[in-house]
Amino acid sequence: MRTIVFLIVSILLLSSAVLMLAEGNAASHELQEYPIEESLEEQRKCVDGSCDPYSSDAPRCCGSQICQCIFFVPCYCKYRGK
C-alpha cells in the first residue's frame, strides 16, 4: 500500500515539475520575441496627457492608461479603474 501511494505521489510531483519547466520555457520564448528595445521605443511614443482615440497619427496613452473623451471636453489619458 505504501509503495502505491509513494508511486502516485512521485508521478504527481514529476508531472508538476515538467509542467512548470514547460511554462518557464514558454515565458522565456515570449520574452525573446519581444525585446526590451521595442518596449522602450513604444514608451517613448506614448503621451501622458491629451490623446485622440480617433486618429491613427496621434500618440497613444502610456502604460495602463486609457484615452477618455466626454462630450466637448478634450480627450485625456487616465489610469484604468480611477
UniProtKB/Swiss-Prot annotation:
Q: Name one GO molecular function term.
A: toxin activity
Q: Where would you say this protein principally sits, based on its record?
A: secreted
Q: Which cysteines are joined by disulfide bonds?
A: C46-C62, C51-C67, C61-C77, C69-C75
Task: Tell me the superkingdom of the source.
Answer: Eukaryota
Q: Which residues form the propeptide?
A: 27-44
| Tissue-wise expression | Expressed by the venom gland.
- Give residues where Arginine amide occurs: R80
Task: State the compartments where it is located.
Answer: Secreted
Keywords per UniProt:
Amidation, Disulfide bond, Knottin, Neurotoxin, Secreted, Signal, Toxin
Q: Where is the signal peptide?
A: 1-26
Cellular compartments per GO CC? extracellular region
Main function? Induces flaccid paralysis when injected into lepidopteran larvae. Intracranial injection into mice causes awkwardness of movement and laboured respiration until death.
The similarity comment for this entry is: Belongs to the rTX family.
Q: What else is known?
A: When expressed in tobacco plants, the toxin induces a significant resistance to the insect S.frugiperda.
Quote the record's domain comment.
Answer: The presence of a 'disulfide through disulfide knot' structurally defines this protein as a knottin.
- Put simply, this protein is called U7-hexatoxin-Mg1a
